[in-house]
Amino acid sequence: MKNVAPKLEDSVYERNFADINPRLTEAQALSEAARCLFCYDAPCIAACPTAIDIPSFIKKITTGNLRGSARTIFEANILGHSCARVCPVEALCEGACVLNQEHKRPVTIGALQRVATDHVLDRGIRVLEAGSPNGRRVALVGAGPASFGCAAELARLGYACRIYERRTVPGGLNTHGIAAYKMRAPEALREVELVRSLGVEIRGGVEVGKDVTIEQLRSEANALFLGIGLGPTESLRIPGENLSGVVDALHFIDRIKNEPFRRIDVGRTVVVIGAGNTSVDAATQAKRLGAESVRVVYRRGPEDVPAYHYEYELAKSDGVVYVFHTLPVRFLGDGALTAIECVRTEVTTDEKGRRMVRAVPGSELRIPCDMAIVAVGQTKAVEWLTRHLSGLELDRGRVKIDGEGRTSLKGVYAGGDCVNGGREVVNAVAEGKAAALGIDPDLGHPRA
């Protein structure tokens, strides 16, 4: 990278990456909890993929029973602590709050959920216990939200669970792929310990398919769960991607999450390609690391931005500038990036009425920059799946399952991003739980 932004004072880094949603005080929590109407057949529960009994945990906060509140949360969602910080609550539980219909501010469910879960984790209070051993074993691939959701549910039913993870540090995107100002890695690792406290074994630094085979796992366990997530960031497949200064958004976010801020170089002028939630995390953090200019280049218009609205607004409030209807075609530079060659685009419709992006002839332009962060989605794990699980049925690169996580292979289950193509942490946990409730009756424990 030719032009690196000057390093900031440590105090500035800490201020820039401080918790974007600070913890409520006890008085604030009690006041906010009192606003809940404790609805019967509460729409907030239906809006939560893990179906946390939200009125119940909030009611317990009003009576000072934070331990019971946390138990209600963790029984439904083993990653309820993380989800309190990173869930898109505006689109889920808080968006469904009935107070919205009265044109009032919804109950800040996420903040209250954090109060309860922080209380028990800060004090080392155990609220969940493993079930009596039933003699059955389950192997899980990938130590992320889906596997945690599955393993925690199974452990409470008495199963011996062992998770295999390629990385040495478990946690999936919670640990490696979410902006540091939303949740620091140590917070995510507290929930990893919660999973371990149920007797779940996590073997890090073990690559399934290389260090141990799928056949070995299937022979040693009664069931196999795939929680492998997605692959690396998609390539743009344009010239110059190997230039110094062109980086993968997920790798960039991972470094910010797990290394000292001062160690991470960022360009003076940065361009982020793509406009999803990962793009926002990359762009805002580049700005907070000291980049003088950060622009997001997107081939469609503002009405098509895939990031959640509040994420989009956060980026703009941080000084990130959006450049719409612009498509990169080449990275320019002599060893190090100096500019991106782009073309303007327009959105048209084809004969079937589908909206299509078309390059405008003669509209070439160059955007000078020192750093380009590619955030255009992740690849699917098709190659790994087809190589190691012959006969596994896929749907557009995603593992095909039924409503309880069963794949086309007997004894093999799946959930999370490898199934849904990349959704939220809470969706992955929910799919892991659903698979556990499919595994249990399949292994001889029918539900009443």
Language-model features and meaning:
Residues 242-267, 350-422:
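FAD-site-proximal beta/loop scaffold in flavoenzymes
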Residues 160-163, 167-198, 202, 283-330, ...:
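Rossmann-like dinucleotide-binding cores of NAD(P)H-dependent redox enzymes
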Residues 137-162, 279-287:
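N-terminal Rossmann-like FAD-binding beta1-loop-alpha1 element of flavoenzymes
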Residues 78, 144-146, 169, 276-278, ...:
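Residue-level detector of alpha-helix initiation sites
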Residues 204-215, 325-336, 345:
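A conserved short coil-to-beta-strand element within the FAD-binding core of flavoproteins
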